[in-house]
């Protein structure tokens, strides 16, 4: 089957004038659009039917030919081809421009591509294009030489003529007996005049010599030179001049010249030559011609892509493009007319400039000068505006399409549903499944045809709902809650038809969707094809999505009422009815409870299945009944954390279906016993502790002392502030302890907080104790505590202070949401082509995972290595036993064994060191945390990584902490810190780090503070003497370089005979040690670095400390670029992973290291070429690391010199824009710049990522196995059914 979509790459390049003409169906010569009386397009206008095709299907403009039978005929009267009206969406026209025009993308970009190629500044280029200056386009060297000679001859002739004239005059004056003074005056005047004449001629000669191709001339200079030397040079202005210059460029010669320049120059000139060389190479490789950047023919967009629609009042609404095209055509026609009638040059020049401006506005309105407005102040949307931004073609229509077979409604809780089900309102389901219901009605003979089936559905007859029930049985639906932050925000459910208008959602999936029932809405989508249904059922069903892909923790854990119910069920109540009774087995105990003889929470003794006597409660027996037999009896209180652990363990034992059944049972238990517990909260449940008054009074006293000391000048403002804060923090902790000690363990408030259902001790402290210290909007703690509790009520001042935090919280949430969303978008873009494409890349490299020194800052080693593959044997330090072999997965048992063995570092495979040239391999990635197994082939791990980091972004704080009282340092934390790291920006407070190993010396004097690092490395140079040689030096003697150390001892010959080149000479200066036939010279190489320390920075080292390169000398954050340059690639990767992990872990968000490693890998995947060697690479070019290694390997195999390069750390935005796929980069940011570069380089998009395939409408490369099978099956089915007549009016997917 030959499909339009059957291609695997897309190339973009510059269009030549001939290509533009070949696309066109005719020239647009008139600015008219449609005739306002007949409402038909004007001939040769912007909507002409002859050029673009008929307005009505198979009907020409004059009406001579109608119907499909005339298809392909061109009407002899009106010239319109008989075809479908939809050809007006694809047929283009063209405008033959009266003069060449510069394409604004190539003339005005930064840097300007035309300017770079012609070595012109943007300012000079603008002067030429907009007809202000002339540029020399050609110089005739022979004519110049001849002109110079002629000038010299003219000069000599003039001087000679003038000389003879003066001689005649002098002779005449002598004859008239004139004074000597008068004669001398004439001679002096002649001398001055001769000098002036020579000077004028020399100036003209210099001007001639200075005439070079590409030089700019003002109008006056041009006319002056043209008058005298019209045959020496040619100059012109406008895009015409540039077209001429660009067409003269010989790319091969230009390349050789620039290569020479990059090697022989340095600094700014070399940098510019490097950029020019890259551009020249781009034109050479892409077979684009530079003159195509100047347009002589302008393509005209098909009319249906710039429509004109009649409104109700008879007026017309039109696309802005039509107005912009109209301006171009009007000016072009006027210019042609002026040129034909031979108008003055100045008028023609002005019209040419106006044409250039009109074309600029059409291509990119507002890039130069004032934007062209239509209808008053509304800025016209140009072709570039249609592509760029959120509302542009890429993001609005290609990446974010609206879909049919979808609906939306409010969600309510569905406590009676199974985990895999959702409640779908009948009316909604009927509309969504309408075609399927109609098809079934016809098939079952309930309706004779589709039309009557539609009528039956619209009347909603009872048999229709019976059919609907059958249809939805085998068709899952997708539920989506916006914002779709991660994979779990879209899940598949089996629909259960319900009455009412609201969707019903299972309470356990709420946390995955981050949904609650306060008015949230969700969207429903219907998977249509068999492949889609199969994928939804096998991978998207909620029972297959119970674990978080970010951390591997359960996401379907019970919450709120369910947690409280389970906690209440498993707690004990001393003195309850039936306490101390003994039962023979669990069933007997449950029977006695049901008869009301014993209380649910009474402590009883029961014999378990193994014959052991347990002290437990009936509630715990009931709870354990729902757990699998493999899980031992849980004889304890079950709060939220315990439920999470139990679910995690059960997931490894049970299948998805059994797991769902167990979770549903826990849910039912939770709801049942939360209801029967009869929990409620009253004001009386919150009691203020008696100790509060004393503690507050003591704190007030300590505060008064600090204030008094400050008033007397004994302590500073900082010390006073810190003392007060410390006092009240301590008091708050003591009151919290007092509240906890006085709690009624059976009280509803305590049980709610302790179970993890709702609330925590901090909130109870604010209700019963005191609210404590508050922060101001900048994040600084206010040194005025709120001493009242919410139970007692706040004073007006206390209430005012507490509003600061509340308002800041709301503002933060709003800002965080957008910031987090943008971060996720950038992360998605940088990793969207990271897909598992290989089983094993075979690398021996890996990364060391080390037990963190600061507990609580990073996850423990056991958590970080779980699910990874080893890159080396893991050996028990005491016994020498191999715990895990090389290249083997570390599962829970092995991870536990590693922890118990006391191993503090493990060498594991990592995405950072994966050597797959495209995507990644399974072993380096390891376990898919959401599925708890080795990652499947074709999994889009890049997207998963981006979602895992972006999704909890809204939970991160948005503030920079202000430390140390009044004058302090801002420490960036939370979301801004994550962004700072991923964008590889210099930190706000940048730490100074040592570039070398050495010893510290801290210097403080009137010039400020300095740190000097001195490094003394001692080396040895050894010289082994042959036997019979005589040493010329002694031990501990100092020798200089070049000094003789030993010489051969020759008998009977004088010393003069011994050749000097036979002696052993010292290669270095140092101290000698002689030991037999071995001479050793010890020498040291010292290195020193000095750093100036700003006054606000805190020094972290002291004099005499020995430090390593890369170690911090001051507080603050390290610039990742410094780590890369000093310590290299591995160190910067480790730094990025650990720093991002610290931010999330400190906020209680668990993300696996591998997700951050995937991003870090993409940030370091490019290298910058230093020297090209024998390769085609250009110095300064950014190249993919793997491509660079491949090119070098080929060159080395052929015996050539390889290129050299250094690793580049790029921020995620830059990395996204420098991706191999130009489609993905253009749809991200800076659309016009990306497309400009891609066109010049003639880039080929191999369609290896996800975005580029979504844009062109192909299936993404990350397909699951079942989906691939179903797609093949469907293609075969369609091929088989192509010959059979389809049932009229049915969707293709019903086949």
From Swiss-Prot:
The catalytic activity of this protein is classed by the Enzyme Commission as: 2.7.7.6
- Any Pfam family the entry gives: RNA_pol_Rpb1_4
Cofactor names from the entry are: Mg(2+); Zn(2+)
Question: InterPro entries attached here?
Answer: DNA-dir_RpoC_beta_prime, DNA-dir_RpoC_beta_prime_bact, RNA_pol_asu, RNA_pol_N, RNA_pol_Rpb1_1, RNA_pol_Rpb1_3, RNA_pol_Rpb1_3_sf, RNA_pol_Rpb1_4
- What keywords are assigned to this protein? DNA-directed RNA polymerase, Magnesium, Metal-binding, Nucleotidyltransferase, Transcription, Transferase, Zinc
Keyword Chaperone assigned to the entry: answer is no
Gene Ontology MF terms? DNA binding; DNA-directed RNA polymerase activity; magnesium ion binding; zinc ion binding
Q: Does the keyword Metal-binding apply?
A: yes
The UniProt entry, under SMART domains, shows: RPOLA_N
Q: So which domain of life are we looking at?
A: Bacteria
Q: Which residues bind Mg(2+)?
A: 516, 518, 520
Per the record, what are the reactions this protein catalyses?
A: RNA(n) + a ribonucleoside 5'-triphosphate = RNA(n+1) + diphosphate
Sorted alphabetically, the Gene Ontology cellular component annotations on this record are: DNA-directed RNA polymerase complex
Q: Where does Zn(2+) 2 bind?
A: 841, 914, 921, 924
EC category: transferase
Q: What subunit structure does UniProt give? A: The RNAP catalytic core consists of 2 alpha, 1 beta, 1 beta' and 1 omega subunit. When a sigma factor is associated with the core the holoenzyme is formed, which can initiate transcription.
Family according to the record: Belongs to the RNA polymerase beta' chain family.
Q: What is this protein called?
A: DNA-directed RNA polymerase subunit beta'
| Lineage per the UniProt record | Bacteria, Bacillati, Chloroflexota, Dehalococcoidia, Dehalococcoidales
